[in-house]
């Protein structure tokens, strides 16, 4: 009898779930799992980079970029933040973004070494340090959802450098300028969340992605014969021009809209 009472007291101390997991909670948590899948894509990309399989690396980064582009709208649609207030989707997103947008591109730039060992090492240092500081800035977004300063999309920058191959000093200058612009109050576009010129900005973003996919497809065909190749040498001039023009547009349109605040605004 005493043993039963002791066992009952012990079971009473064990915390029990107050309620079952509801369908909205399970659905909301699945969005966090979608975001978290980017970490595995980052791992696959890192493996490819360590083996100097640049085409595969950028395919994995591109897939991670796609996941990053859809998880936010889905989370807002399903009201994930309100349903699971103790789970921070924003923190999870930032952790994965730092790896896929910053750390792996910096490693690839250093590993590729087309700027020479010294400049590649210095460029990687500029990328990872400036980006870490940027992610700590809680005021990185404006009221219109522009990014304030270069939004550390080093995956796009490094991809462009791999494809265009402008030379070591031009490449280094691009890294330095982008690193400085991280801390300059110039607006950069968020193609989805900025309302002004959104259809056109989305079109240019999709065009950049399309040119990027074509570049990787061309490189993949060439890599069928040589798995470890130079990405830029395998891409046609037309695609290089397309990536350059659309990339420059996305880099500059935010600043242009900042200085022309009525550009793209709906008339009252």
From Swiss-Prot:
Superkingdom in the source lineage? Bacteria
Main localisation, per the record?
A: membrane
Query: How does the protein associate with the membrane?
Result: Multi-pass membrane protein
Question: Mind telling me which residue stretches traverse the membrane in this protein?
Answer: 28-48, 54-74, 89-109, 113-133, 146-166, 169-189, 204-224, 241-261
The entry's localization annotation reads: Cell inner membrane
Q: Which InterPro entries match?
A: CDP-OH_P_trans (IPR000462), CDP-OH_PTrfase_TM_dom (IPR043130), PcS (IPR026027)
| This enzyme's EC code(s) | 2.7.8.24
Key words of the record: Cell inner membrane, Cell membrane, Lipid biosynthesis, Lipid metabolism, Manganese, Membrane, Phospholipid biosynthesis, Phospholipid metabolism, Transferase, Transmembrane, Transmembrane helix
Q: Which reaction does it catalyse?
A: a CDP-1,2-diacyl-sn-glycerol + choline = a 1,2-diacyl-sn-glycero-3-phosphocholine + CMP + H(+)
Write out the topological domains of type Cytoplasmic: 1-27, 75-88, 134-145, 190-203, 262-268
Q: Which family does it belong to?
A: Belongs to the CDP-alcohol phosphatidyltransferase class-I family.
Protein purpose: Condenses choline with CDP-diglyceride to produce phosphatidylcholine and CMP.
Question: What's the name of the protein?
Answer: Phosphatidylcholine synthase
Q: Which organism is it from?
A: Mesorhizobium japonicum (strain LMG 29417 / CECT 9101 / MAFF 303099)
Instruction: Recite the lineage of the species.
Output: Bacteria, Pseudomonadati, Pseudomonadota, Alphaproteobacteria, Hyphomicrobiales
UniProt gene name: pcs
């Amino acid at each position: 009898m005493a043993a039963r009472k002791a066992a009952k007291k012990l079971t009473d101390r064990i915390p029990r779930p107050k309620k079952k997991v509801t369908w909205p909670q399970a659905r909301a948590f699945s969005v966090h799992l979608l975001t978290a899948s980017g970490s595995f894509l980052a791992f696959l990309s890192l493996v490819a980079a360590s083996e100097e399989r640049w085409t595969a690396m950028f395919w994995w980064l591109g897939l991670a970029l796609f996941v990053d582009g859809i998880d936010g709208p889905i989370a807002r649609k399903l009201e994930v933040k309100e349903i699971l207030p103790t789970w921070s989707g924003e923190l999870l997103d930032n952790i994965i973004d730092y790896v896929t947008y910053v750390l792996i591109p910096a490693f690839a730039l250093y590993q590729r070494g087309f700027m020479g060992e010294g400049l590649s090492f210095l460029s990687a240092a500029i990328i990872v340090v400036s980006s870490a500081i940027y992610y700590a800035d809680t005021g990185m977004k404006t009221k219109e959802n522009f990014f304030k300063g270069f939004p550390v999309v080093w995956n796009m920058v490094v991809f462009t450098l791999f494809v265009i191959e402008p030379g070591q000093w031009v490449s280094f200058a691009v890294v330095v300028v982008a690193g400085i612009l991280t801390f300059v109050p110039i607006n950069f576009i968020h193609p989805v969340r900025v309302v002004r010129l959104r259809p056109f900005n989305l079109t240019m973003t999709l065009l950049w992605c399309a040119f990027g996919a074509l570049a990787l497809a061309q490189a993949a065909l060439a890599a069928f014969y040589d798995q470890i190749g130079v990405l830029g040498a395998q891409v046609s001039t037309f695609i290089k021009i397309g990536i350059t023009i659309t990339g420059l547009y996305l880099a500059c349109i935010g600043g242009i809209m900042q200085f022309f605040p009525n550009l793209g605004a709906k008339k009252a």
